[in-house]
From Swiss-Prot:
Protein name from the UniProt record: Intraflagellar transport protein 81
Region (CH (calponin-homology)-like region): 7-139
A Pfam family reported for this protein in Swiss-Prot or TrEMBL: IFT81_CH
GO molecular function list: tubulin binding
Notes concerning its domains: The CH (calponin-homology)-like region shows high similarity to a CH (calponin-homology) domain and mediates binding to the globular domain of tubulin.
Function: Component of the intraflagellar transport complex B (IFT-B) involved in flagellar assembly.
Main subcellular location: other
Length: 672
């Protein structure tokens, strides 16, 4: 056989490390990196060797130390300790010397060691077999003794005793393996026999149950046929009642449509009423959805409904199966007949429950119809009251002029208007101030334009009703008083100087007021934009209100349609309940519950007995494993005692034969 290559060894190591109890998720690249690092490679070997370390069976219950942590300081020490009990996996027939083991250890601690790959692959190839081999080798392999001590006679004596003990251990081990193999084979044979017995009993029980079902079908078929006819008649009556209720619902729906179309009121009242109606409809839809889910869960029972043809066939076969029915009754009497009175009571209680349920549903439908009629009457009365107390033309005009803005949108616009109110007030104040100053400037220009005419016509006298007075908070001067004093040349020069100063002040004032004028224009544009936005939002709110009313109307129509559909589903659910009742009665009569329970208890008790026997066998096996060395020693001792007793018996027989021969010789001598 060709030895494995390094690639095969690496693949074996990788596969072994990916299996329990390691589960390292190792790859060839990761393993190669680990093997190139001596410390990591030795740590991996220590973890693997920890799973196959030699320990006696008595040490299983004791706490064992965890695997060692490898570092550069204890590298050779750990390698030597692992090599002592794992080297047996490499060559079982060769006893290695101390020098060979030292060379093996020195090569084991190298980077990418071949011995490391060989040792890991040998352990991980079969972990259970490696563990057993190492355990057995602890007792079978001879110890490594230096050659200097081999000449000692005491060492030779101890070695001979060790070889004898190892031979006894090998013999006991082989006997134990034979015993375990025999016990396993016996256990397998016993389990196979038990399985065959149980399968035979199960088949017999199944045959009896099938026979019981076949014999109970004809009698039950007649009863089912009669009950089915009664149930179908009840279903037809229920359909008639539900159709009449649907007609009443349609009338209520038409009345509700008329109320919705004729309703008038403020937008707030309409919105509040619509929200309340929407909440009520949502809750009703949730309740109806739950009822639909409950009724749909019973739809699968319709699939197993017996057809009319099958029932008629059962009725025709009734006469031919009467003899079999007599046999079935005799068989049932041996097992135990079912209590007919209990069955009748159960059927009556079930029918009473179904009748109560149908009455409850009918009462609920009547209550809902009464509530719908009462609400319709209230709405009609409210509409009539409003129409009688209010002029419809003026009411429609007020509704058209009213801003029907939703509450959230109205609050948003109100907050924006409140934020812009201080800016608007400031702009209006500044606009008023500018108007006053503009009037003053216009008046001053008129006065200044009149001054040259006055100086030309009356250079000595100039009268005017106006005058100079400071304005604008003391920041500028204007003409306040021109009159009462004659204008001469000197006064004219002073007036020109004053006018020049006034002109400069006016120009400076215009430059100062230019930003404020532009800001005022921007504020005006912003106010105009805000008014346009408000108008557009109002228009949008009106559109949303109209669309919302249409959506509410459509939602009501869809809810009414769903109610009609739910009524149909209720009808189908009632039909399903009746059919389910028929099927349940058929199943109750067909199944022999008592026989099934008794057989189930018997099978369960037998399974428990088998489990108890298996547990006892396992306990005996564990006890045998623990007491194997002592028993083997006792076996040897008993064999020695038996051989001694046989030798003594044989010696006694030989002495008796010698004594008898001597007696015969004495008789012969006496006779002669």
């Amino acid at each position: 056989m060709q030895p494995p290559t390094s690639t095969d060894q690496l693949q074996t190591i990788t596969d072994g490390l990916n299996l329990p109890p390691f589960e390292r998720r190792m790859t060839l690249i990761t393993l190669s990196e680990i093997l190139h690092d001596p410390v990591r490679a030795m740590q991996l070997l220590a973890d693997v060797a920890y799973q196959v370390r030699p320990h006696s069976l008595a040490e299983d219950s004791k706490a064992v130390p965890p695997p060692v942590k490898v570092n550069a300081a204890n590298l050779e020490q750990v390698a030597a300790g692992i090599t002592d009990f794992t080297v047996c996996l490499l060559n079982l027939n060769e006893s290695r010397s101390m020098a060979d083991k030292q060379a093996f250890v020195q090569e084991l601690v190298l980077s990418d060691s071949a011995n490391m790959r060989v040792l890991l692959s040998a352990i991980l190839k079969d972990l259970a077999a490696s563990r057993e081999t190492i355990y057995v080798s602890k007792f079978k392999l001879p110890p490594v003794i230096p050659a200097d001590y081999m000449v000692d006679p005491q060492i030779q004596t101890l070695l001979s005793q060790l070889r004898e003990a190892q031979s006894r251990f090998t013999e006991a081990l082989n006997q134990n393996r034979d015993v375990q193999k025999d016990q396993i084979l016996q256990k397998m044979e016993r389990l196979a026999t038990d399985k065959t017995t149980f399968l035979t009993r199960r088949d017999k029980l199944f045959d009896r149950v099938k026979q019981a079902k076949a014999l109970s079908v004809p009698k039950e078929a007649v009863r089912l046929a009669s009950r089915r006819r009664v149930a179908l008649s009840e279903i037809e009556e229920l359909k008639t009642q539900i159709n009449s209720q649907n007609e009443i619902r349609r009338a209520a729906l038409n009345a509700a449509k008329a109320v919705v179309n004729s309703a008038r009121g403020t937008p707030a009242n309409i919105l509040e009423a619509s929200e309340a109606e929407n909440k009520r409809l949502k809750q009703e839809i949730i309740n109806l959805t739950a009822e639909i889910t409950e009724k749909e869960s019973l739809a699968h029972l319709i699939q197993s409904e017996p057809g009319q043809e099958a029932i008629e066939l059962m009725e025709n076969e009734l006469e031919t199966l009467r003899t079999d029915l007599v046999k079935y009754r005799e068989m049932v009497s041996t097992v135990g007949s079912p209590d007919e009175e209990d069955n009748e009571q159960e059927k009556m209680s079930f029918l009473n429950q179904q009748i109560t349920k149908i009455k409850t549903q009918r009462a609920q439908l009547e209550n809902r119809l009464t509530n719908a009629r009462r609400e319709s009457a209230e709405v009609d009365a409210e509409v009539a009251k409003r129409c009688s107390s209010t002029d419809m033309a003026s009411l429609m005009k007020d509704i058209d002029d009213m801003d029907s803005i939703p509450m959230l949108l109205f609050k948003n616009l109100l907050s924006k208007g409140r934020a812009l109110k201080p800016l608007h007030k400031k702009a209006m104040d500044e606009q008023q101030l500018l108007r006053k100053e503009n009037a003053i400037v216009s008046r001053t220009k008129d006065i200044l334009a009149a001054i040259p005419n006055l100086s030309a016509e009356a250079p000595d006298e100039l009268t005017d009703a106006g005058g100079l007075r400071p304005i604008g908070g003391g920041k500028q001067r204007v003409l306040g008083s021109i009159g009462g004093v004659g204008l001469n040349a000197k006064n004219l020069m002073e007036a020109k100087a004053v006018l020049a100063e006034l002109d400069a002040t006016l120009q400076q004032k215009k430059r100062d007021l230019a930003p404020r004028v532009s800001e005022l224009a921007a504020l005006k544009r912003q106010c105009a934009q805000l008014e346009a936005d408000t108008e557009s939002e109002n228009q949008r709110a009106r559109t949303l209100e109209v669309s919302r009313e249409g959506s509410v109307y459509k939602l009501r129509l869809s809810v009414r349609a769903l109610e009609l559909e739910i009524d149909n589903l209720k009808t189908q659910a009632i039909v399903t309940d009746k059919k389910a009742e028929l099927l349940r009665l058929e199943l109750e009569q067909a199944d022999n519950v008592r026989e099934f329970d008794r057989l189930k208890r018997e099978i369960t008790s037998e399974n428990n007995a088998c489990k108890t026997q298996m547990m006892e066998i396992r306990a005996k096996q564990e006890e045998l494993k623990c007491n194997l060395p002592n028993r083997m020693a006792q076996n040897k001792l008993f064999k020695s005692l038996v051989s001694i007793l046989e030798f003594r018996k044989q010696a006694a027989l030989e002495r008796q034969e010698d004594h008898a021969a001597e007696m015969r010789m004495d008789k012969i001598r006496i006779t002669n």
